[in-house]
Amino acid sequence: MQVQEKFTAETFPASPEKVTLEGKNKFLGFWLFLGGETVLFASLFATFLALRNSNAGDPPTTEMFDVTLVFIATMLLLTSSLTSVYAMYHMKNFSFGKMQLWLGITILLGAGFLGLEIYEFKHYTHEFGFTITSSALGSAFYTLVGTHGAHVAFGLMWISTLMIRNAKRGLNLYTAPKFYVASLYWHFIDVVWVFIFTVVYLMGMVG
């Protein structure tokens, strides 16, 4: 099959990301990339767990963490993972318009999550004086959660760029693997957040 070949809903491959050698290489390269990302976050989690009780003069996390705010942010990000699944479903069914729609919703939900995270950081800073330099816990917290937030921002820019650049190209064996890999990346940062929610916030709320 040709990369730029024109398809219909009936002739589009069920797994377009794996049809061409380029697509397979992107797929393999991405999993290797995720391996490195996993090591990065594992080291940040280990550091946080080692320093979680080193809060110096900062208020305890049981007083600072807002369970309602974090829960809403979590629901936004998890829902965005679901909308990303819908987008890939429509991609595999050669429905470019619906795929773009669900990716747009994914971006809005991700942006909402990022906005709440920025608000959360400002709240901790202004209300409690809890900053990245106020204690070892502060350094570990902002590095871990902030690194994840940076990954979310990168994911939003990545998906947005794909949507804009390929708006006229539509779906083919060149563009489909790019959308698929971006979707996998989005799922990865969602999974990382589940661990952050559990290790940082739930454990922090119980002391």
Curated annotation (Swiss-Prot):
- Asked whether the UniProt record includes Translocase among its keywords, one would answer yes
Catalyzed reactions per annotation: 4 Fe(II)-[cytochrome c] + O2 + 8 H(+)(in) = 4 Fe(III)-[cytochrome c] + 2 H2O + 4 H(+)(out)
Q: Which GO terms describe its cellular component?
A: plasma membrane
Entry's EC annotation: 7.1.1.9
User: Which SUPFAM superfamilies does this entry report, sorted A to Z?
Assistant: Cytochrome c oxidase subunit III-like
What GO molecular functions are on record for this protein?
cytochrome-c oxidase activity
InterPro entries recorded for this chain?
A: Cyt_c/ubiquinol_Oxase_su3 (IPR024791), Cyt_c_oxidase-like_su3 (IPR000298), Cyt_c_oxidase_su3-like_sf (IPR035973), Cyt_c_oxidase_su3_a-hlx (IPR013833), Ubiquinol_oxase_su3_dom (IPR033946)
Positions the record marks as coiled coil are none
Describe its membrane topology.
Multi-pass membrane protein
Compartment(s) of residence: Cell membrane
The UniProt entry's sequence similarity note says: Belongs to the cytochrome c oxidase subunit 3 family.
Q: Which PANTHER family match?
A: CYTOCHROME C OXIDASE SUBUNIT 3, CYTOCHROME C OXIDASE SUBUNIT III
What is this protein called in UniProt?
Cytochrome c oxidase subunit 3
**UniProt organism field:** Bacillus subtilis (strain 168)
